[in-house]
Amino acid sequence: MTLKSSEGEGGNSMRTALSDLYLEHLLQKRNRPETSLNQSNVTTEDMYTNGSPAPGSPAHAKGQEARRVRLIQFEKITEEPMGITLKLNEKQSCTVARILHGGMIHRQGSLHVGDEILEINGTNVTNHSVDQLQKAMKETKGMISLKVIANQQSRLPALQMFMRAQFDYDPQKDNLIPCKEAGLKFVTGDIIQIINKDDSNWWQGRVEGSSKESAGLIPSPELQEWRVASVAHSAPSEAPSCSPFGKKKKCKDKYLAKHSSIFDQLDVVSYEEVVRLPAFKRKTLVLIGASGVGRSHIKNGLLSHNPEKFAYPAPYTTRPPKKSEEDGKEYHFISTEEMTKNISANEFLEFGSYQGNMFGTKFETVHQIHKQDKIAILDIEPQTLKTVRTAELSPFIVFIAPTDQGTQTEALQQLQKDSEAIRSQYAHYFDLSLVNNSVDETLKKLQEAFDQACSSPQWVPVSWVY
């Protein structure tokens, strides 16, 4: 049930443990009874055109084709939308294009995608536009009668798939959506249950935990990635920036070069498939934030208040040790040649240089903390998030934002600007965001949130399990 991992035995063992946990969770859910759809106030009656016989009759058995027409009647007594969209097929017949999960029609189970509608309340739909028919369906109240030819190929099982949104979406601001009222609004980090993805451009989903039971339309990953790439293509070119927090320069040539898969993964985000696991312990606490936001104070506070729970992996450096420094305590001192060799062997999760000396944190140092049954604290650059967000490290990622109180000095404004640049580019990785108005207050909220995460069911990337 597990896939190969390039992180070594530690990564494989952690992935296996999470896979076993997920399998146990699925087995516990297997015997739960399913709820049936509400079909009250709906009547159906089979009819046959041109005197064609019913299926099973001798004439039908000889291969004569029968166009089976169903008369569907139901009462619409509220302003609730019917949750249905129509289209004209290649024969210019009116067919059901989409049924929103949880909507009125879906709950009744009276229509299915692909069904052909012949009449609405006795009126033949021929020579009517889709907009006219949609309006008629929307404005009709009381008893509604439909004559329908069923599409027998549309009876597909319900989809069970969950995705974490990696962008904010408001259907009212989307000019591409076929029906704004049918759209689903969500924000980065929302868990969306995917109900239907038959349409390559518009999936149906609902936000997990929302009071709204009916599904809404959301852009498919392909459509969203095309949209972002199109915006990048049309954006004016910018001068390259060396700042890690500067606005990322979109390279249209790279994207046009046959949609490089690596470029897509790095620059275009839409959704991430996730699974829900029972409570398990996160092994790493990652602090993300702009320089000067107070991550070091928070890290030191956690280490001093809970030395038995948290530990910080001592970085490796090529600079000479000071007289008061002990090798392996605050730093591991190493030669430039050896560090370069270790970097080539992918032993560092993060490395860089400062004032001519190299610094870096090794995976091995983090693993040693885990073996002591402690939680490793990492205060890394946001570019490293892709590297650490694995089942092997099982991180809980916290974004520290600058204070929103006090005098707006020039330094604070710059800090807020840098923080917003990080948030806008990496927010889809964050498990928690905290405003650091007070170190003590931030420490309290962080520890409470971390403990809550480790003791509650959690949504994790599907790659952590399979």
Curated annotation (Swiss-Prot):
Q: Where is the SH3 domain?
A: 158-228
**Record region (Interaction with PALS1):** 268-466
Cited Gene3D superfamilies:
2.30.42.10, P-loop containing nucleotide triphosphate hydrolases, SH3 Domains
Q: Where is this region: Disordered?
A: 29-65
**Record's keyword terms, sorted:** Acetylation, Cell membrane, Cell projection, Lipoprotein, Membrane, Palmitate, Phosphoprotein, SH3 domain
Modification(s) after translation: Palmitoylated.
Lipoprotein as a keyword of this entry, yes or no, is yes
What residue stretches are annotated with the Guanylate kinase-like domain? 282-451
Bias type Polar residues, positions: 34-52
What is the annotated localization of this protein?
A: Cell membrane; Cell projection, Stereocilium
> Pfam families, from UniProt?
Guanylate_kin, PDZ, SH3_1
Q: In which tissues is it expressed?
A: Abundantly expressed in the erythrocytes (at protein level).
Q: One GO cellular component term, please give it.
A: membrane
Domain of life of the source:
Eukaryota
> Residues bearing Phosphoserine?
13, 19, 52, 57, 110, 243
* InterPro entries with a match to the protein in the record: GK/Ca_channel_bsu (IPR008145), Guanylate_kin-like_dom (IPR008144), Guanylate_kinase_CS (IPR020590), MAGUK (IPR050716), MPP1_SH3 (IPR035475), P-loop_NTPase (IPR027417), PDZ (IPR001478), PDZ_sf (IPR036034)
- SMART domains to which the protein is assigned, alphabetical: GuKc, PDZ, SH3
**N-acetylthreonine modification sites?**
2
Mind listing the GO biological process terms from this record?
A: regulation of neutrophil chemotaxis
Q: Where is the PDZ domain?
A: 71-152
Q: Which residues carry this modification: Phosphothreonine?
A: 49
Q: What does this protein do?
A: Essential regulator of neutrophil polarity. Regulates neutrophil polarization by regulating AKT1 phosphorylation through a mechanism that is independent of PIK3CG activity.
**Family per similarity comment:** Belongs to the MAGUK family.
**What assembly does the database describe for this protein?**
Heterodimer with PALS1. Interacts with DLG5 and NF2. Interacts (via guanylate kinase-like domain) with WHRN (via third PDZ domain).
The protein in question is named 55 kDa erythrocyte membrane protein
Q: What is the native source organism of this protein?
A: Mus musculus
List the taxonomic lineage. Answer: Eukaryota, Metazoa, Chordata, Craniata, Vertebrata
Gene encoding this chain?
A: Mpp1
